[in-house]
C-alpha cells in the first residue's frame, strides 16, 4: 500500500530568477561562442551562479580573474567582462594588450557608473552605499580616481563618517541591496548632510525591488522560505533576509535541490519559493520536483508584477541567431519569449 504524502502549498514568487541584465550577460557569452568558437574568456564569474558558470564552461568558456591569465596564443579570442561591471582600468588594460572584448556590464550598473561620474563632474564627493569587496562595488569605485569615493555599508557607517566639504556630497547605491536597509542608510546620511545630492534616478534596480516585493508579500504564514541562489550572490542573500523579516518561520539559501536539509525542515505545510536574479529557472523546477517526491504539492503563484524588460546584446554579435536550444541549459522550457525579443533593434 502506497503511503499518502502530506499536503504542501508552495507559494511560487513572481518575478523570480533571471533579470534582463543576467539574461543579456549569459546570452553574450553564448553568442560569442557561436560566432567566434571556443575558447571565449570571461573575466570573473559572468554572474554569481555555479550552475550557470559550469554550463558555460562545458560549452567552451574559460573563466579568469585577470586578463594576464589569458595565454598569448589565445589573445585573438574574445574576452567578456561580467555583468557586475569593471573598473575603467580593465578595458584600458585590454586595449593595451590588443584584446577584443565584449562588455556584459548590466545597463543598470552602467547607469550607476554614469551617476557617480556626474556627481564628480559637479564637484561632489561620491558616497557609494554597498558591500565591500563585491565586484559591482569594485567596478563602480573604479570609475573615479582614488579617494573620490567613500564606501558606506551600514547605518553605523553613515552615522560616523566625516567629509572635508559636507555641502558637496552625492550618493549612489549598489543595485542589488535590500531596499529597506538602504532606506535606513540614506535617511541617516540625509539627516547629517542636508545638502546630500541623490542620483537622478533610483540606483537599486527594478529586478531587485520586484523580487523583494514578491518575497515580502508571500512570506507571512510560510513555515519555510527557500531562495535559490549562490552564497556570493548579494541579491539572493538579501531575499533570505527579506523573507525572515516579513514573517517566514525559517528561510534559507540553496543552490540545488540536493542542498535542502530535509531533516532540519521538520513539519511544514506552506513553503515560499523564489530565486535570485542570477539563479536559473531550471533549478527552481528541480526544487519543485524534489518537494513533489515527498509531498502532495499544490502550487500557488504569488505574483506581484510582470517584467517585460529586455536589453540588447553587443552590436558585434547581433548577427548571430539565439535559439531556445542555446539557452535550454539554464531556462529549460521557460522564458522563450525573451529570445525572440532579443534581436529587435539591430
UniProtKB/Swiss-Prot annotation:
Cofactor (UniProt): [4Fe-4S] cluster
Residues that hold dimethylallyl diphosphate according to the record: 48, 84, 134, 233-235, 278
Record organism: Brucella abortus (strain S19)
Designated name of the protein: 4-hydroxy-3-methylbut-2-enyl diphosphate reductase
Biological role: Catalyzes the conversion of 1-hydroxy-2-methyl-2-(E)-butenyl 4-diphosphate (HMBPP) into a mixture of isopentenyl diphosphate (IPP) and dimethylallyl diphosphate (DMAPP). Acts in the terminal step of the DOXP/MEP pathway for isoprenoid precursor biosynthesis.
Family: Belongs to the IspH family.
Catalysed reactions, semicolon-separated: isopentenyl diphosphate + 2 oxidized [2Fe-2S]-[ferredoxin] + H2O = (2E)-4-hydroxy-3-methylbut-2-enyl diphosphate + 2 reduced [2Fe-2S]-[ferredoxin] + 2 H(+); dimethylallyl diphosphate + 2 oxidized [2Fe-2S]-[ferredoxin] + H2O = (2E)-4-hydroxy-3-methylbut-2-enyl diphosphate + 2 reduced [2Fe-2S]-[ferredoxin] + 2 H(+)
Cofactor, how bound (note): Binds 1 [4Fe-4S] cluster per subunit.
GO molecular function, one term: metal ion binding
Record-linked NCBIfam families: ispH_lytB, PRK01045.1-4
EC nos: 1.17.7.4
Residues that hold isopentenyl diphosphate according to the record: 48, 84, 134, 233-235, 278
Pathway: Isoprenoid biosynthesis; dimethylallyl diphosphate biosynthesis; dimethylallyl diphosphate from (2E)-4-hydroxy-3-methylbutenyl diphosphate: step 1/1; Isoprenoid biosynthesis; isopentenyl diphosphate biosynthesis via DXP pathway; isopentenyl diphosphate from 1-deoxy-D-xylulose 5-phosphate: step 6/6
Phylogenetic classification of the source organism: Bacteria, Pseudomonadati, Pseudomonadota, Alphaproteobacteria, Hyphomicrobiales
Keywords: 4Fe-4S, Iron, Iron-sulfur, Isoprene biosynthesis, Metal-binding, Oxidoreductase
Catalytic residues (positions): 136
Enzyme class: oxidoreductase
Amino acids binding [4Fe-4S] cluster: 19, 106, 205
List of residues binding (2E)-4-hydroxy-3-methylbut-2-enyl diphosphate: 48, 84, 134, 175, 233-235, 278
Gene Ontology biological process: dimethylallyl diphosphate biosynthetic process; isopentenyl diphosphate biosynthetic process, methylerythritol 4-phosphate pathway; terpenoid biosynthetic process
Disulfide bonds: none
Encoding gene, per UniProt annotation: ispH
Amino acid at each position: 500500500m502506497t503511503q499518502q504524502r502530506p499536503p504542501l502549498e508552495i507559494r511560487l514568487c513572481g518575478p523570480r530568477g533571471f533579470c534582463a541584465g543576467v539574461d543579456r550577460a549569459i546570452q553574450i557569452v553564448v553568442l560569442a561562442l557561436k560566432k567566434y568558437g571556443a575558447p571565449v574568456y570571461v573575466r570573473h564569474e559572468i554572474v554569481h551562479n555555479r550552475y550557470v558558470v559550469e554550463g558555460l564552461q562545458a560549452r567552451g568558456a574559460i573563466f579568469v580573474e585577470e586578463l594576464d591569465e589569458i595565454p598569448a596564443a589565445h589573445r585573438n579570442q574574445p574576452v567578456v567582462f561580467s555583468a557586475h561591471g569593471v573598473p575603467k582600468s580593465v578595458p584600458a588594460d585590454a586595449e593595451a594588450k590588443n584584446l577584443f572584448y565584449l562588455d556584459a556590464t548590466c545597463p543598470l550598473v552602467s547607469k550607476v557608473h554614469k551617476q557617480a561620474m556626474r556627481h564628480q563632474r559637479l564637484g561632489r564627493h561620491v558616497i557609494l552605499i554597498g558591500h565591500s569587496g563585491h565586484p559591482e562595488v569594485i567596478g563602480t569605485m573604479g570609475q573615479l580616481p582614488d579617494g573620490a569615493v567613500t564606501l558606506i555599508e551600514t547605518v553605523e557607517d553613515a552615522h560616523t563618517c566625516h567629509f572635508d566639504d559636507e555641502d558637496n556630497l552625492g550618493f549612489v547605491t549598489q543595485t542589488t541591496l535590500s531596499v529597506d536597509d538602504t532606506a535606513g542608510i540614506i535617511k541617516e546620511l540625509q539627516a547629517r548632510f542636508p545638502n546630500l545630492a541623490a542620483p537622478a534616478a533610483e540606483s537599486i534596480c527594478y529586478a531587485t525591488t520586484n523580487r523583494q516585493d514578491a518575497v515580502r508579500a508571500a512570506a507571512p504564514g510560510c513555515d519555510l522560505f527557500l531562495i535559490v541562489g549562490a552564497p556570493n550572490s548579494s541579491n539572493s542573500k538579501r531575499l533570505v533576509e527579506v523573507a525572515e523579516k516579513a514573517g517566514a518561520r525559517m528561510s534559507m539559501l540553496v543552490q540545488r535541490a540536493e542542498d535542502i536539509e530535509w531533516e532540519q525542515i521538520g513539519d511544514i505545510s506552506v513553503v515560499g519559493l523564489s530565486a535570485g536574479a542570477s539563479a536559473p529557472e531550471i533549478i527552481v523546477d528541480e526544487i519543485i520536483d524534489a518537494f513533489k517526491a515527498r509531498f502532495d504539492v499544490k502550487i500557488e503563484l504569488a505574483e506581484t508584477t510582470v517584467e517585460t524588460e529586455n536589453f540588447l546584446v553587443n552590436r558585434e554579435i547581433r548577427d548571430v541567431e539565439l535559439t531556445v536550444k542555446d539557452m535550454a541549459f539554464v531556462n529549460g522550457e521557460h522564458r522563450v519569449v525573451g529570445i525572440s525579443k532579443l534581436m529587435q533593434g539591430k
